[in-house]
Amino acid sequence: MIDTTLPLTDIHRHLDGNIRPQTILELGRQYNISLPAQSLETLIPHVQVIANEPDLVSFLTKLDWGVKVLASLDACRRVAFENIEDAARNGLRYVELRFSPGYMAMAHKLPVAGVVEAVIDGVREGCRTFGVQAKLIGIMSRTFGEAACQQELEAFLAHRDQITALDLAGDELGFPGSLFLSHFNRARDAGWHITVHAGEAAGPESIWQAIRELGAERIGHGVKAIEDRALMDFLAEQQIGIESCLTSNIQTSTVAELAAHPLKTFLEHGIRASINTDDPGVQGVDIIHEYTVAAPAAGLSREQIRQAQINGLEMAFLSAEEKRALREKVAAK
């Protein structure tokens, strides 16, 4: 189901949602951090989704053990490096890794700007080692409020040339986009792209707000767009992409079952939608699973899956020249 003549991308992938269970175990031992289990087999139910969670907020608690072991900037650097190694193992040629430095820093009160620098270093070294092309998206964790998001924004701005885009993630219902208008004004002034988690827990009005008020060029998840025909028309006409995450939307109970997922309808409507993982370490999936298992289960035809793969590159925060070079590099293999 994956077209090997085309670049394989993952443009909605949380770095802090892809910390290996084995790494959690090792860092826990290294820093004498009490974990809920002492073997890999018994730890996995605590750090991976075994049964679907009742809602998004419940799902997000599964990420907590991964960041609780980030007791130093070296630990942050390690998990960033391993994220690139995992991407290479999955056959990804290009990945956009997004991360919330405030969330990663929280358990051990690490300097937020230091976390950003450590992630940049780890990703850079991983790209050199494994030959993967990567860009970084800064996340503001709306769940922690406006002031915490401001701190994250300042940390990103201190490294503005290494950050490609700004995102807003977390509790969409409790912390609407309207609270963060000034943050996104500064992001646009910095020349960054904008992608926003919207229409996952909240309705289509959240997507409209992300586009009109925050300047979103892409929407993370965006499943509730299916409820608003005018919105779907607008997304298609304006080529505002939807970063679909199939398995994730089932595990968060955002969508009841894969057969009911709106990705197929989005593609039929001419919306530029792509296939992505979200939090692969927590979900226990990889991009290959999403293409070969989840996408067919969601009713996508072989041609629709190929179109979603094409869309992944077209939606990427790359220049036209970078996209062309990536296509040529894959075609030459």
Curated annotation (Swiss-Prot):
Pfam families associated with the record: A_deaminase
Recorded GO CC terms: cytosol
GO terms (BP aspect): adenosine catabolic process; hypoxanthine salvage; inosine biosynthetic process; nucleotide metabolic process; purine ribonucleoside monophosphate biosynthetic process
SUPFAM superfamilies (alphabetical): Metallo-dependent hydrolases
Site (Important for catalytic activity): H221
InterPro entries, A to Z: A/AMP_deam_AS (IPR006650), A_deaminase (IPR028893), A_deaminase_dom (IPR001365), Ado/ade_deaminase (IPR006330), Metal_Hydrolase (IPR032466)
Cofactor binding comment, as recorded: Binds 1 zinc ion per subunit.
Catalytic activities: adenosine + H2O + H(+) = inosine + NH4(+); 2'-deoxyadenosine + H2O + H(+) = 2'-deoxyinosine + NH4(+)
Binding residues annotated for substrate, in chain numbering: H14, D16, G170, D279
Cofactor(s) listed: Zn(2+)
Active site positions, chain numbering: E200
Keyword match Zinc: yes
Assigned keywords, A-Z: Hydrolase, Metal-binding, Nucleotide metabolism, Zinc
Binding site for Zn(2+): H12, H14, H197, D278
E.C. number: 3.5.4.4
A single MF term (Gene Ontology): 2'-deoxyadenosine deaminase activity
Entry's family note: Belongs to the metallo-dependent hydrolases superfamily. Adenosine and AMP deaminases family. Adenosine deaminase subfamily.
Task of the protein: Catalyzes the hydrolytic deamination of adenosine and 2-deoxyadenosine.
Name of protein: Adenosine deaminase
Gene transcribed to yield this protein: add
